[in-house]
Amino acid sequence: MRDMRASSPETTSAVKCPFNKTAVEGTHNKDWWPNQLRVDLLHQHSNKSNPLGETFDYAKVFQKLDYAALKRDLHALMTDSQDWWPADFGHYGGLFIRMAWHSAGTYRIGDGRGGAGRGQQRFAPLNSWPDNVSLDKARRLLWPIKKKYGQQISWADLIVLAGNVALESMGFKTFGFAGGRVDTWEPDQDVYWGREMTWLGGDVRYGAVSEGVHHPDEHSGAKEKASKNSDSRVLENPLAAVQMGLIYVNPEGPDGRPDPLASARDIRETFARMAMNDEETVALIAGGHTFGKTHGAAPADNVGPEPEAGELEQQGLGWHNRFGSGKAGDTITSGLEVTWTKTPTQWSNDFFEHLFGYEWELTKSPAGAYQWVAKDAAATIPHAHDPSKKLLPMMLTSDLALRFDPVYEKISRHFHAHPDQFADAFARAWFKLTHRDMGPRVRYLGPEVPAEELIWQDPVPKVSHVLVDAQDLLALKHKISASGLGISQLVSTAWASASTFRGSDKRGGANGGRLCLAPQNQWEVNQPQQLSVVLETLRRVQTEFNAQAGDKRISLADLIVLAGGVGVEQAAKRVGIVVEVPFVPGRTDALQEQTDVSSFAPLEPFADGFRNYVKGDEVVPSEHLLIDRAQLLTLTAPEMTVLIGGLRVLGANVGGVKHGVFTDRLGTLSNDFFINLLDMGTEWAPVSKERHVFEGRDRRTGVLKWTGTRVDLVFGSNALLRALAEVYAAVDAQEKFVRDFVAAWSKVMHLDRFDLV
């Protein structure tokens, strides 16, 4: 929901440090060089910030949880109204549903970031977003339960479970619940929320559409522009919210303009970017708005700063409300004042009854926000804190989108006529919403994990054969070595398979062998023509091995990874170092019908610096995109560095381009990349004004020696990365380089093997 009180994400006063020459004040590197490469993003969430220590195993501790007792306590909490924050209608269900929704709803499919999986709603900026007003109170209401069960339930799990129990306590049958979300202890720094410097601004993500929304009485020129261009405006990737500080859309309409059809376009775009189709979108909006209410008792100037800007005595709570009692019937959250149904604490079909049962006319809330009131309607809606009062039916602009958009209307009318199908659709969509970033089912914990396998979970078959042993692996390695495939082909294919993994939502990776399926087998970065040759060859090896007597088998997914390891071992042997690349069998091959092509499309890399690849124009400097990809692969800066150096000399570049191949021993796992990059006998210069590709010439003769991209040269330019490159360029570094490369390579190959944890 929209909050209209904060204009910019700033604190109310500067912090003054009484001591001189401390780290609290002073100018920092980011102040001098705001565009500096964020290598620090690769070192987030270290054990130094984790009070539980590196040996803490949440999955093991969760198994000790008295889950039934926890749910009983949550059920009791729903109607245990507290004087310091009274429950609407005597039931906290609506508040906890909103808390869980807004925790999960930050997820976006573009990069897999956001979502409920880390408990990030506790930290800035999410704890202070305008859309999250009053959720600080929801988490405080949960604290006694979190305190009671301690580390047996994470905040991340508890927030979602509270939403589930809220639904159940109001008569709704949920689809299930899975635990397994592990808390982090500091804000995520890698999530791009947009570049706007004003809360509720959309001027950057839509290209100068809105400068922010601050409770206007009249439409501004920017809003008129937004409305006129609402058909064609394009939301910046990977964002999935229309304004800074919102979860999805502005409930008043695009940039505050009360236009249901324009709102529908925003809804469709933002929900699609969270991997929801039209039916799921309607089910979520209608199902969620069956419960609870919005809050806009008075204008926004009654509300104080958000939690991160609050004073010490507020103890992490924000948005202190000076209107009336500041709570209950005087609450100000979104500025809107809407209760959707006659039974806001019971599951019903009332939302659709009202949506289609009335005609609607524009009005304003007591806070001045645009909303809609039913024409010629009786006052049938209960007051949240005064049983003697009844209110007129109200709707949001974003609600009316479900009636006036033709596609949404058809779905809504179907759900109206078939309430059982509506309930099932909402249950499934809610489960998807709250579990989308958890990765494969093998990570799910608890007694309420649903048995049904869902396509969006990227299912892979269970292992149904005897796995290969050490002797088999030796025989298979020999077959691969004799297959005629080169080191470059073996390495680049394995990398293409495994490097789709995203630590954000735990999707991608080598398990499932989806490199062989659409859409991955047609991605430009995977060199489809070469890929088909490699896969055909490996299939012959697989077929021959699996034709043996007995139940022993190897999957193509396993064979691709094993073959990559063979390439690495061969390349290491060329520098006189014998290594065994770790390999653990157990991957299986998914079927095409187990693969949602549209859902996998966002995993296609726009840029992969590890393969010196950029698709189309470089909008963002490629070295920054490298950091982004390395972070998704959960790599540290040293791991990223050693992988770049190794993949270059192994010939993993897309299309066989020579940029960054600083060696005359291609296919040899040497440290030549670093030696030649740091050679002061080479002088570098851009080949064009775009500065994407550079030439390295002999400083004395001018003879061309090498070409490199921004990704290559950053390892000599950036001070932090150069320090790492110097380690691997040293005379005594060859063996360390090989062993570090093998370790980093093995990490990437096994990132999705949650079955091994």
From Swiss-Prot:
Question: Which cofactors are reported in the record for this sequence?
Answer: heme b
- Chain positions of site Transition state stabilizer: 98
What PTM annotation applies here? Formation of the three residue Trp-Tyr-Met cross-link is important for the catalase, but not the peroxidase activity of the enzyme.
Q: Which gene encodes it?
A: katG
Q: Where is this region: Disordered?
A: 210-231, 293-312
The main enzyme category here is oxidoreductase
Mind telling me where the Tryptophyl-tyrosyl-methioninium (Tyr-Met) (with W-101) cross-link is?
248-274
Catalytic residues (UniProt): 102 (proton acceptor)
Keyword field = Heme, Hydrogen peroxide, Iron, Metal-binding, Oxidoreductase, Peroxidase
What family is reported?
Belongs to the peroxidase family. Peroxidase/catalase subfamily.
Catalytically driven reaction(s): H2O2 + AH2 = A + 2 H2O; 2 H2O2 = O2 + 2 H2O
GO BP annotations listed: cellular response to hydrogen peroxide; hydrogen peroxide catabolic process
Q: Its Gene Ontology molecular function terms? A: catalase activity; heme binding; metal ion binding
Q: Which Gene3D superfamilies match?
A: 1.10.520.10, Peroxidase, domain 2 (1.10.420.10)
GO CC annotation terms, alphabetical: cytosol
| Annotated protein name in UniProt | Catalase-peroxidase
- Supply the Pfam families for this chain: peroxidase
Q: What is its EC number?
A: 1.11.1.21
Summarizing the function annotation, the protein's role is: Bifunctional enzyme with both catalase and broad-spectrum peroxidase activity.
Give the NCBIfam families listed for this entry.
Answer: cat_per_HPI, PRK15061.1
Bias category Basic and acidic residues: which stretches?
Answer: 212-231
Q: Where, by residue number, does heme b bind?
A: 289
